[in-house]
Curated annotation (Swiss-Prot):
Entry function: Multifunctional regulator of fatty acid metabolism.
DNA-binding residue intervals: 34-53
Record's subunit section: Homodimer.
GO MF annotations, alphabetized: DNA binding; DNA-binding transcription factor activity; fatty-acyl-CoA binding
Official protein name in the record: Fatty acid metabolism regulator protein
Organism: Vibrio cholerae serotype O1 (strain ATCC 39315 / El Tor Inaba N16961)
Keywords per UniProt: Activator, Cytoplasm, DNA-binding, Fatty acid metabolism, Lipid metabolism, Repressor, Transcription, Transcription regulation
Annotated compartments: Cytoplasm
InterPro entries per UniProt: FA-response_TF_FadR, FadR_C, TF_FadR/GntR_C, Tscrpt_reg_HTH_GntR, WH-like_DNA-bd_sf, WH_DNA-bd_sf
Length: 279
């Protein structure tokens, strides 16, 4: 297998995960002893130990003192964060994972948004107004750099929106605009989820963040997708302000259908790095 990684720990993690996925260390099997495995991968035992602990926390492995490390049935023991990893392992099924994400968001949003609009109306309105104004400023700015220079939240945005090594300035601007728009889209859903009064909804979005960023950074490279999303945000705000929460399911469902149509077009020309791991 060909593995690209930025650090020995990253290499070891990818090696073990890909070995589990490809059947070299199948679910239910026992991993080689620590010394043997560290020599096989080419990392120190200290590095390997740290990686094994992290993989155990993520549900890939079971580590018990005095017993061999066991490979789990990871689809039964892992959380939502595994979805982004599955994108990198199973590129052929990447689009179905995206569609599952979009469908799940459409299904749960009417529930938590209804509670957010009822229990924390003013906070919900502030979030949506902030997102709408920020997204309008972003798409109307002459460039991403100009938007950042004028934004009072520039430092926070740059903590979350990372630049890559794109040399073409036009492509760089397009990439950063898409990533920043996705930053606001995620903010709207995640914060409304927490304002529902049920922290589980917010934690669901936390668990999906890496996958959400991967998908949104591509999806929102489409100006049509950005315009559709902003109109959706405005409709949500209108529902919240009017108190007519019974309209939420229809508004969200219509957006889910329309955004699904855009995705169905975009998935035909996925970029080569769409399923690449960034670790």
């Amino acid at each position: 297998m060909v593995i690209k990684a930025k650090s020995p720990a990253g290499f070891a993690e990818k090696y073990i995960i890909e070995s589990i996925w490809n059947g070299r260390f199948p679910p239910g099997s026992i991993l080689p002893a620590e010394r043997e495995l560290s020599e096989l991968i080419g990392v120190t035992r200290t590095t390997l130990r740290e990686v094994l602990q992290r993989l155990a926390r993520d549900g890939w492995l079971t580590i018990q003192h005095g017993k061999p490390t066991k490979v789990n049935q990871f689809m039964e023991t892992s959380g939502l964060h595994i979805l982004d990893t599955l994108m990198t392992l199973d590129a052929e099924n990447a689009t179905s994972i995206v569609e599952d994400l979009l469908a799940a968001r459409t299904n749960i949003s009417p529930i938590f948004m209804r509670y957010a609009f009822k229990l924390n109306k003013e906070s919900a309105e502030r979030i949506m107004i902030n997102v709408i104004e920020s997204c309008e400023a972003l798409v109307n700015a002459p460039s991403w750099d100009a938007f950042i220079a004028a934004s009072p939240y520039a430092e926070k945005i740059q903590q979350h929106v990372k630049e890559d090594s794109e040399k073409d300035e036009l492509k760089r601007q397009e990439i950063l605009i898409a990533k920043t728009f996705n930053f606001y889209d995620y903010m709207l859903f995640q914060r409304l989820a927490f304002h529902s009064g049920n922290q589980i909804y917010g934690l669901i979005f936390n668990g999906l963040k890496k996958l959400y960023d991967r998908v949104g950074s591509y999806y929102f490279s489409n100006p049509q997708a950005r315009e559709l999303a902003m109109e959706f945000y405005r409709q949500l705000l209108a529902v919240c302000q009017s108190g007519e929460r019974e309209h939420l399911p229809q508004v969200i469902r219509q957006y889910g259908i329309a955004s699904g149509h855009i995705w169905n077009q975009m998935k035909m020309t996925l970029p080569s790095n769409f399923t690449e791991d960034d670790c």
